[in-house]
Amino acid sequence: MTNWTSAVCEANGIDIHYLRTGGSKPPLVLLHGLTGSGACWSPLARALEAEFDVVMPDARGHGESSTPQNGYCYEDYARDVVGLIQGLRLAAPVLLGHSMGGMTAAVVASQMGAAIRGVILADPTFLSPQRQREVYESDAVEQHRRLLSLDRGDVLAQARDRHAHRRPEIVELVAEARMKTRIAPFDVLTPPNPGYHRLVSAICVPILLVIADNGVVSLETAQELQNLNPRLRVEQIQDAGHGLQYDQPARFEVVVRSFLRLVAAS
């Protein structure tokens, strides 16, 4: 990581902070979920940086990026990503997004067409209207307010207890990201989400949908989406929850590498 760039790009009228591995290699843009940050992708980026120019932005309201007063719907996040791609002059990048970042990647891919090379959706927030309402009416915001009132040591201790099965580095990266997430981004939980059936149908490049055995997107939904778009492949990672790239990083890397090889050969 010592040779990585840490910089800011003006995109969609705000400053987007990003980490970048660099080099004259195919670009790969990694989009984190709500309460994450670009740095949460560091283990995967280390594994891929010999072959890819990996770009890891902090979404608005997260990490070191700007926190505008409003503008926290998926269309806003997507415009930020498009602005980043244009600002950094990334030619035909592959997008990889998790959770909120997965939905954002789907929106971007549906809009940019063949200007991107492929898209990986890691347990994206493809929620039914009822589930969206349940999440919106939950105490997620209050839970985050309470977390922000704790000191760093307490947050890390809670994270280690809750995720004892995860690598210590991953636990710390995710905990640090949570502490740098402001309240405003939780507006993204306000229904309705973009219609994911429409988005997936509109994507014209190869798609990898990575799901967990205990995540958000069910195998039935994945198969339904596969029927909508023949470009979509599905991989299920066992013994993983919604944070599948944290729960099973080695298996996640394998399926990502396999898809990236497929895209490179197409």
Predicted features along the sequence, with ranges:
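Conserved alpha/beta-hydrolase catalytic His-Asp/Glu region
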Residues: R131-Y136, L147-C204
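Alpha/beta-hydrolase fold catalytic core
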Residues: M1-L28, E49-F52, L90-A91, R117, ...
